[in-house]
Amino acid sequence: MDTKQTMFALATAPFNSAIHIIRLSGPDVYRIINQITNKEVKPLGMRIQRVWLIDHNQKKVDDVLLFKFVAPNSYTGEDLIEISCHGSMVIVNEIIGLLLKHGAVQAQPGEFTQRGYLNGKMSLNQAASVNNLVLSPNTTLKDVALNALAGQVDARLEPLVEKLGQLVMQMEVNLDYPEYTDEQRELVTMNQAVVQITQILNQIVVGQDQLQRLKDPFKIAIIGNTNVGKSSLLNALLDQDKAIVSAIKGSTRDIVEGDFALNGHFVKILDTAGIRQHQSALEKAGIQKTFGAIKTANLVIYLLDARQPEPDPKIIARLKKLKKDFFLVHNKADLVQQSFQVSISAKQKQIQPLVDLLTQYLHQFYSVEQNQLYLISDWQTILLQKAIAELEHFLIKQQNCLFFDILVVHLRAAHEYILQVLGKNTNYDLINEIFKHFCLGK
């Protein structure tokens, strides 16, 4: 990455829409912008300026708004202008052509945030949280990313790295002046501090197992006999005709998927082949896919016909063997007088009892410990696990070893790993690995 270059990127999705935003950042922002506008644009004065963009023949390209951010008070820490133009991709491509012609270069994924990090506008954890925030599939992970963006990770780890640094310094002083050192007493004090730091780091790392399962889409598999209304339920949940609804038994032989949002959580729902005893070869293949979908699902909706409300005990046994949570839902409730615990009419789109139950389940599934610090990125967890391993080596060795020059190696290594989590002493390979997963314009 060459920070001497002025970069640009389309910050909005690349298709026709109401407006588009093109970001321009770097040392030559005002030189470039003044070559393609009908009036002078200065870093002082109005922060929002309306101008015409023009080409080399003075032909008008678009009527735009320029949002000006003057260094160092910008996202990147550089001079930055956001061009708000009309939403045609024809206009966007013309503007990009003008920027390229006058010396701007296409930004790499995550380069705006990376420059912000390098220019001291945010820590590495805050920078990484930006992408996690953009990609968060549910409100829980969104909140975790926002906490990191607010500096929660740095605030929790900085006292630990400071304490470790003091311990390393203390051991190095003792190595230089051994005649003034009571090694046994020093080690007792250090041992207490290292135990405390290790416990805190372990608490942080343990929480990642809970968070990991929330990163994948929540999957619901709809299963049941043929012609019980599974496709109608899928369509009712999606509020669109995604699956073919037919009175012919065995119509669905492949898995039909659909995505919908429920109370801030994205859900992937799978409509599966109907299960019955007498099947054609094609239906048997479809049923195998059904059981495959059950294995990958977080939750199973076992749909029953309210006129034949008893579930198949073999299917119930299989669900329990797989340790799958499941709901027994009685469909076609409009055709009977009897009321069940969860009764719906998918065809009539009367599914609110099921929606309420799903909402309650999702709330419980996505609930996390409020006071727990969560690291949303795997690289953070890996580095902390390495730090913990070094601290544990220290605790084991200090029981039988009084040589500070051996023990201090482990404290230095642990200190270094936590510094890397904080974005200090971080190698460029890790930095590039973090930012390459960002989207363009961020």
From Swiss-Prot:
Q: What is its EC number?
A: 3.6.-.-
So which cofactors does this thing need?
K(+)
What GO CC terms are in its UniProt record?
cytosol
Q: Which organism is it from?
A: Mycoplasma pneumoniae (strain ATCC 29342 / M129 / Subtype 1)
> What are the GO BP annotations of this UniProt entry?
tRNA methylation; tRNA wobble uridine modification
Pfam families under this entry? MMR_HSR1, MnmE_helical, TrmE_N
Gene expressing this chain = mnmE
Q: How is the cofactor bound?
A: Binds 1 potassium ion per subunit.
Full protein name? tRNA modification GTPase MnmE
List of residues binding GTP? 227-232, 246-252, 271-274, 331-334
Q: Which residues bind Mg(2+)?
A: 231, 252
Which NCBIfam families is this protein grouped with? mnmE_trmE_thdF, small_GTP
Residues that bind K(+) = 227, 246, 248, 251
Q: Does the keyword Magnesium apply?
A: yes
Which PROSITE patterns does the record associate with it? G_TRME (PS51709)
- Residue ranges of domain TrmE-type G in the record: 217-363
Q: Where does (6S)-5-formyl-5,6,7,8-tetrahydrofolate bind?
A: 23, 82, 121, 442
Oligomeric state and interaction partners are given as: Homodimer. Heterotetramer of two MnmE and two MnmG subunits.
Q: Is GTP-binding set as a keyword in this record?
A: yes
> What is its biological role?
Exhibits a very high intrinsic GTPase hydrolysis rate. Involved in the addition of a carboxymethylaminomethyl (cmnm) group at the wobble position (U34) of certain tRNAs, forming tRNA-cmnm(5)s(2)U34.
Upper lineage: Bacteria, Bacillati, Mycoplasmatota, Mycoplasmoidales, Mycoplasmoidaceae
Q: Which GO terms describe its molecular function?
A: GTP binding; GTPase activity; metal ion binding
Q: Where is the protein found, in the record's own terms?
A: Cytoplasm
Q: Which family does it belong to?
A: Belongs to the TRAFAC class TrmE-Era-EngA-EngB-Septin-like GTPase superfamily. TrmE GTPase family.
Keywords recorded for this protein, A-Z:
Cytoplasm, GTP-binding, Hydrolase, Magnesium, Metal-binding, Nucleotide-binding, Potassium, tRNA processing
